[in-house]
């Protein structure tokens, strides 16, 4: 409250000369501070990226001969590991699929009406209808052949 009265009574608002000079210096100081902070952060990140690059080059220089010497062993081993991992993942996925199919069949056969049972019943009815139509058509042709 006292600050509000002082601003109104003392005239220390934005309209007088002293406040305007302070306002012009404020953005310059903030800009300078932001620039120094950005330069410091950018410079330190540049130094760190250079150190990481140098470390990577040194590590590759040391590791390349080792990889070349052991590549006849490492490459087939990596291929074998990849194939084994793919086999385990595939067998696990197929096992889960088989369990879900058996679960669905159990629910269907016990009458618990799992999702998709209506479609299966509809397809079964259509197949039975077509089979009946084919049987009747075949019986009709047999009767015609015997009559002539």
Swiss-Prot record:
InterPro entries: Oleosin. Its main location: other. GO terms for cellular component: membrane; monolayer-surrounded lipid storage body. Residues 2-34 are annotated as: Polar. It comes from the Eukaryota. Belongs to the oleosin family. This is Oleosin 16 kDa. It comes from Oryza sativa subsp. japonica (Rice).
């Amino acid at each position: 409250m006292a600050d509000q009265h002082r601003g109104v009574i003392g005239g220390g608002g934005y309209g007088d000369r002293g406040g305007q000079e302070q306002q012009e210096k404020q953005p310059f100081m903030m800009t300078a501070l932001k620039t120094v902070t950005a330069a410091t952060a950018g410079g330190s990140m540049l130094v760190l990226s250079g150190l990481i690059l140098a470390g990577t080059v040194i590590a590759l220089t040391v590791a390349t001969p080792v990889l070349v010497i052991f590549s006849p062993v490492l490459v087939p081993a990596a291929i074998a590991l990849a194939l084994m991992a793919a086999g385990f993942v595939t067998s696990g996925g197929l096992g889960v699929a088989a369990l879900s199919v058996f679960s669905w069949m159990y629910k269907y056969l016990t009458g618990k009406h799992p999702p998709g049972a209506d479609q299966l019943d509809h397809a079964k009815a259509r197949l039975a209808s077509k089979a009946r139509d084919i049987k009747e058509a075949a019986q009709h042709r047999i009767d015609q052949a015997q009559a002539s």
